[in-house]
């Protein structure tokens, strides 16, 4: 609609210019000169016709865009369409399965590779797995592990001291990867916050206690990951 009005206004403007030019020439040289002047004026100014058309059409497009934006804003304001779209999205997710977990009463599943609180494991006979090779102590980047060992009567080596400073540990899992007998592992527990620093200094008894508590779960996790180690 705006484009049609623009073209009509342009045609009216051209006609008026031609008429004014014809009247000016007629006053001096008569009717024949009027026609000649009209044709000359039209010929002289014909080069600007295409340019004017382009300008008018561009203006019409801009006006059309402006009116469309005004119309859209008016509709949104009048009928509150944005709020309706938001409510529709809310209703869509209202009936879908909830993804929120009400922690700590609900807990999500943990990966078998989860690295949590440390533990020392035993064999089924009750014998400690650790052979005091000190590979875990050597590989620990945080230097959080301290081991002391001695030789037993049968010639085997066993630890007399196995300490982990949990405030230094970065839970990289290198100790577990380095252990040749799967003695030191990182268990599934992540809720071991304490009120004092001393409670985070784990000794051998504490680590063995953790291993006895989670042995079933730890063994299952190691079994499921055995193909990828």
UniProtKB/Swiss-Prot annotation:
Q: In which tissues is it expressed?
A: Lowest expression found in storage tissues of tubers. Higher expression in older leaves than younger ones. Highest expression found in flowers.
One GO cellular component term: mitochondrial inner membrane
Tell me, in one coarse class, where this protein mainly resides: mitochondrion
Q: Quick one: which residues bind [4Fe-4S] cluster 2? A: 140, 169, 172, 175
Keywords from the named record: 4Fe-4S, Electron transport, Iron, Iron-sulfur, Membrane, Metal-binding, Mitochondrion, Mitochondrion inner membrane, NAD, Oxidoreductase, Repeat, Respiratory chain, Transit peptide, Translocase, Transport, Ubiquinone
Which cofactors does this gene product need? Answer: [4Fe-4S] cluster
Q: What is its EC number?
A: 7.1.1.2
Outcome of swapping residue 62 to K: In strain: cv. Bintje
Query: Gene3D superfamilies from the entry?
Result: 3.30.70.3270
Where is [4Fe-4S] cluster 1 annotated to bind? 130, 133, 136, 179
FT transit peptide: 1-41
One matching Pfam family: Fer4_7
Q: Where is the 4Fe-4S ferredoxin-type domain?
A: 121-150, 160-189
Q: Cofactor: bound how, per the entry note?
A: Binds 2 [4Fe-4S] clusters per subunit.
Q: Which GO terms describe its molecular function?
A: 4 iron, 4 sulfur cluster binding; metal ion binding; NADH dehydrogenase (ubiquinone) activity
Q: Name one GO biological process term.
A: mitochondrial electron transport, NADH to ubiquinone
The name on file for this protein is NADH dehydrogenase [ubiquinone] iron-sulfur protein 8, mitochondrial
Q: Tell me what organism the protein belongs to.
A: Solanum tuberosum (Potato)
């Amino acid at each position: 609609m705006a484009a049609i009005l623009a073209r009509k206004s342009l045609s009216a403007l051209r006609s008026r210019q031609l008429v004014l030019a014809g009247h000016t020439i007629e006053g001096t040289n008569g009717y024949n000169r009027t026609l000649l002047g009209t044709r000359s004026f039209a010929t002289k100014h014909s080069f600007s016709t295409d340019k004017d058309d382009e300008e008018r059409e561009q203006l019409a497009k801009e006006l059309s865009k402006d009116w469309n934006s005004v119309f859209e804003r008016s509709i949104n304001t009048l009928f509150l369409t944005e709020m309706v779209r938001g409510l529709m999205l809310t209703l869509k997710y209202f009936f879908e399965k909830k993804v929120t977990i009400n922690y700590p009463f609900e807990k999500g599943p943990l990966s078998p590779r989860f690295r949590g609180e440390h533990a020392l494991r035993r064999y089924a006979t009750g014998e400690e797995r650790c052979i005091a090779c000190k590979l875990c102590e050597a590989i620990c980047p945080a230097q959080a592990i301290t081991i002391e060992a001695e030789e037993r009567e049968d010639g085997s080596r066993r630890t007399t001291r196995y300490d982990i400073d949990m405030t230094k540990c970065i839970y990289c899992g290198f100790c577990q990867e380095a252990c040749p007998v799967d003695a030191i592992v990182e268990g599934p527990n992540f809720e071991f916050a304490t009120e004092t620093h001393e409670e985070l200094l784990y000794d051998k008894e504490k680590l063995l206690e953790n291993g006895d508590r989670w042995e079933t779960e730890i063994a299952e996790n190691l079994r499921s990951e055995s193909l990828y180690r």
